[in-house]
Amino acid sequence: MANITAMALTPSKQLDASFALPDFALPDVVSGKTTIPADFAGSKALAVVFLCRHCPYVVHVMPTLLALAHEYLDAGAAFVGISANDAANYPDDSPQRLKDMVVSRRIPFPVLYDESQDTARAFHAACTPEFYVFDPERRLAYHGRFDASTPGNNVPCTGHDLRAALDAVLTGQPAPEPQHPSMGCNIKWK
């Protein structure tokens, strides 16, 4: 396991209840195809996950996130991952290395690369992993953590908080409160 003490633990920022899905046009690291929000039209919920390869907090949640994504994709939700880390200084987060991760882990949703970091700024993203759930009108319903588990705290990784938010949005209910901030490695800004 990576040395967690060497990582800068960063919380996500609180967003206003009126926050709506920002527009973006980013390349899929596997296909190279430009992905835009309209590609997820028709989904009952959209989960956006800021992630990377090297952060131990992302590595910690990834197996459970993949299982949860498979379950909720079948229920009508859509997922998209976005990596915005500066690949020049963090080559493990380059598009090619992200592609290797997507293929080897069989990630069931597109992972996009935000080279300019403009999309991360539009989302007010601060850390990896960081989770957003948008309703069918693409209004923010949830912004926060995956669950209470972190590397080394011995709390089982279940995806409880993200799961509760997705369940609420898929049934037309408001997401549960309180929404706890995500905690992870800071986005590696240029």
Which residue stretches match the model-derived regions?
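Chalcogenol-based redox active-site neighborhoods
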Residues: 2-179, 186-190
